[in-house]
């Protein structure tokens, strides 16, 4: 009976931590860059683009393909930074909780 109570208490702790992490991640902002800083893409914790900055030197018709590639690269850079930040935050907030090896929280 005590084991069941302990498990329920731990489950509640995990649920509370998950909610706290999700709230904090919503406010997270990361900037991805490409082309040596010619393109900057800002994402929030929900992987929504909140800003794009493009150096005016890329705004030429003959540069459109390069521009498209750089925007994608900057987006992917920001997305990777968000994922790393989420993973680090989750690890720090769930330290000490009895989670199975390889357990991942669903935050997308």
Swiss-Prot record:
InterPro entries (alphabetical): YbaB-like_sf (IPR036894), YbaB/EbfC (IPR004401)
Gene3D superfamilies xrefs: Nucleoid-associated protein YbaB-like domain
Pfam families: YbaB_DNA_bd (PF02575)
SUPFAM superfamilies tied to this protein: YbaB-like
Domain of life according to the entry: Bacteria
Gene Ontology cellular-component annotations: bacterial nucleoid; cytosol
Gene Ontology molecular function terms on file: DNA binding
Subcellular location: Cytoplasm, Nucleoid
Keywords recorded for this protein, A-Z: Cytoplasm, DNA-binding
Family: Belongs to the YbaB/EbfC family.
NCBIfam families (alphabetical): DNA_YbaB_EbfC (TIGR00103)
SUBUNIT field: Homodimer.
Function: Binds to DNA and alters its conformation. May be involved in regulation of gene expression, nucleoid organization and DNA protection.
Designated name of the protein: Nucleoid-associated protein BQ02190
Originating organism: Bartonella quintana (strain Toulouse)
């Amino acid at each position: 009976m005590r084991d069941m109570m302990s498990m329920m208490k731990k489950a509640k702790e995990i649920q509370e931590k998950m909610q706290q992490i999700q709230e904090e991640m919503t406010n997270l902002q990361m900037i991805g860059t490409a082309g040596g800083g010619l393109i900057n893409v800002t994402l929030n914790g929900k992987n929504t683009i909140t800003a794009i900055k493009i150096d005016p030197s890329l705004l030429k018709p003959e540069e459109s393909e390069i521009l498209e590639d750089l925007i994608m690269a900057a987006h992917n850079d920001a997305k990777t930074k968000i994922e790393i930040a989420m993973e680090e935050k989750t690890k720090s907030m769930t330290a000490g909780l009895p989670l199975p090896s390889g357990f991942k929280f669903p935050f997308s």
